[in-house]
Amino acid sequence: MKYIQKTNYQFDLDQLNFEWNNIKEFYLTKDHWYQEVQTCLQHSETCVDKYTEGCGSIKRAGGRTERDFCLINDIYRGTLFETIINELNVVRSRIMISKRHTVYSIHIDRTKRSHLVLNTNPDTFFILSENTIEKSEIMHIPADGYIYMVDTTKPHTFVNAGEESRTHLVMCHG
């Protein structure tokens, strides 16, 4: 079974990285980051902190669902990021950075996720499984501008065993 599917959606990776680097350099401050590795592109109507309340586990959201995080943050208006969010009709979109030599705990998400890799290294990969090694899928998602649909409703983790960090745009399907 394929837990990770390359879609037909492809976007201009150079433009995305140009916009991301400008936003990161000129607009984002330390306060816009959750644990220095996540920042939100969307917020809910009740957010006090529009850039961090949708980060981390959805359990942190105080009863809100992923669908509640549907409003685009101002600094992303008019960007290719907004175009992608609108075209895919996704919610709770975040930039997630996996620092070098890190791994997430195995967990299950409530909804599937779309991933668009902004930058990566060859030693990063998802591991998804049905609790047996025979049914596991291990995959590196390249920085090729394509959207990849990942069934994160199955037990999974992400590993960055490389020397460089990787940056993904992660979007939820509510």
Predicted regions and their residues:
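Short, conserved beta-strand element in jelly-roll/cupin
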Residues: 97-98, 108-124
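A short hydrophobic beta-strand segment most commonly corresponding to one strand
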Residues: 114-120, 147-149, 163-174
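A short glycine-rich, His/Asp/Glu-containing loop-to-beta-strand
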Residues: 80-100
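A short beta-strand-loop-beta hairpin characteristic of the jelly-roll/cupin
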Residues: 119-143
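Short beta-strand His + acidic residue motifs that chelate non-heme Fe in jelly-roll/DSBH
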Residues: 104-106, 124-126, 141, 149-163, ...
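Non-heme Fe(II)/2-oxoglutarate
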Residues: 1-85
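Intrinsic-disorder/low-complexity, polar/charged segments enriched in Ser/Thr/Lys/Arg/Asp/Glu/Gln
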Residues: 2-4, 111-113, 168
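Residues that flank catalytic or metal-binding motifs in active/ligand-binding sites
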Residues: 91, 110-112, 165
